[in-house]
Amino acid sequence: MEKEKFPFQVLNLERSNHFPKLDDLTHIILLGGPMNVYEEDQYPFLRQEDLFIKEAIQRGKRILGICLGAQLIAKALRAKVYKAPVKEIGWYDLSLTEEGRADPLFSRFPRTFSAFQWHGDTFDLPNAGKRIVTSSPVPNQAFRYGENAYGLQFHPEVTEELIEQWMKEYDEEFETEKPPHFSKEEIRRGTLMEWTDYSSRGRILISQFLSLH
């Protein structure tokens, strides 16, 4: 966003429950977090965020949710959010749907591509939502609602440094999975192999989102 010279502010809702006025915003990006959308008693800000998202969608604001952010948008649209059949941590092959191949955010993506994931929950496709990226066994990897609301289960925003930071901070993920279907070594190999193309596509995706009017 700095490269695009797009003015922005970053809010950490765990530290502050201050929400900006929607009239002051042109685009909204909801990032991930370690909490789940249904843990509202433990994280009370999630209730207020749900109302914020609903109003943003009703007013046609351009909104992009990533991982937890996608699940929050799905929930705001009355779709069910629940445990995925498997935890996806690391690099996974995804595919564009017919809708996805025509979508402005993904028009420069190949039909199949590798993406970085870190999630244990998934969501049903909202009513009137369009699935634009899919995979197996977690089919709802990205959706669009209307013209301006997007939810992405994968992480186009990550950096190599952030991947290493997550593996350090959430080390227990690699100890509790029985049997393990991912490892730090596999993730590092995937990052080495995929990073140049993936980081470029991530920049394109965010740039395309910021270009929505």
Functional labels for PLM-detected ranges:
Residues 30-100:
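Cysteine-nucleophile active-site neighborhood
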Residues 1-3, 44-48, 81-82, 133-134, ...:
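Glycine-rich, phosphate-binding/catalytic loops in enzymes
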Residues 77-161:
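Pocket-forming structural segment of enzyme catalytic cores
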Residues 1-59, 179-213:
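N-terminal beta1-alpha1 cap of cysteine-dependent amidohydrolase-like domains
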Residues 133, 138-146, 151-213:
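C-terminal and late-domain segments of enzyme folds
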